[in-house]
Swiss-Prot record:
PANTHER family given in the database record: 30S 40S RIBOSOMAL PROTEIN, 40S RIBOSOMAL PROTEIN S9
Protein known as: Small ribosomal subunit protein uS4
Domain S4 RNA-binding: 103-167
Superkingdom assignment: Archaea
UniProt source species: Staphylothermus marinus (strain ATCC 43588 / DSM 3639 / JCM 9404 / F1)
Keywords per UniProt: Ribonucleoprotein, Ribosomal protein, RNA-binding, rRNA-binding
GO (cellular component) term, any one: small ribosomal subunit
GO biological process per UniProt: ribosomal small subunit biogenesis; translation
Stored InterPro entries: Ribosomal_uS4, Ribosomal_uS4_arc, Ribosomal_uS4_CS, Ribosomal_uS4_euk/arc, Ribosomal_uS4_N, S4_RNA-bd, S4_RNA-bd_sf
Record's function text: One of the primary rRNA binding proteins, it binds directly to 16S rRNA where it nucleates assembly of the body of the 30S subunit.
PROSITE patterns the record matches: RIBOSOMAL_S4 (PS00632), S4 (PS50889)
Family from the record: Belongs to the universal ribosomal protein uS4 family.
GO molecular function (one): structural constituent of ribosome
Pfam family, one: S4
Length: 168
């Protein structure tokens, strides 16, 4: 059976935690995307940082190794909805944390008009009123792929869905 893996942090905080411009920018992002704490923001920054690091190392790699890995990375980022179809590694280097935060379920629920505010979207998700293709998702930080984006709706058993059907 084996030993369980050691749980590791999935984020890395800022190197200088008290720089005013960093604090102001983080606070603005927390409010814009309805994040609960800075750890959620740092997790997104870490994911983007890893993608960009991967792209930089691929740009430095020899051509025969680079082609297959580059195609896999670009395909993955396209499926996540972070890049357009004909993107290159230079586009990966231009990714920002806002690009990733736009793909969170919380943001997509708000942008689709299923919630009145970004905070309301978070509450709907946590309380189980939101589903993707009929499957209930209760994590506001869930990264919605390009295929799933059109399938985001109220859960089948949600009273919100029933009230909309009655109005129609």
């Amino acid at each position: 059976m084996g030993d369980p893996k050691k749980p590791r942090k999935k984020w890395e905080g800022p190197r200088h935690p008290w720089r005013k411009e960093v604090l102001v920018q983080e606070l603005k992002l927390l409010g814009t995307y309805g994040l609960r704490n800075k750890r959620e923001l740092w997790r997104a920054q870490t994911i983007v940082r890893k993608f960009r690091h991967q792209a930089r190392s691929l740009l430095a790699a020899p051509q025969e190794i680079r082609e297959q890995a580059e195609k896999a990375l670009l395909n993955r980022l396209y499926r996540l909805g972070l890049l357009h179809e004909n993107a290159s590694l230079e586009d990966v280097l231009g990714l920002t944390v806002e690009d990733l935060l736009e793909r969170r379920l919380q943001t997509i629920v708000y942008k689709k008009g299923l919630a009145r505010t970004i905070y309301h979207a978070r509450q709907l998700i946590i309380h189980g009123h939101i589903a993707i293709a009929g499957r209930r998702i209760t994590s506001p930080g869930y990264i919605v792929s390009r295929e799933e984006e059109d399938l985001v709706d109220y859960a089948p058993t949600s009273p919100f869905k029933k009230s909309i059907e009655e109005k129609a």
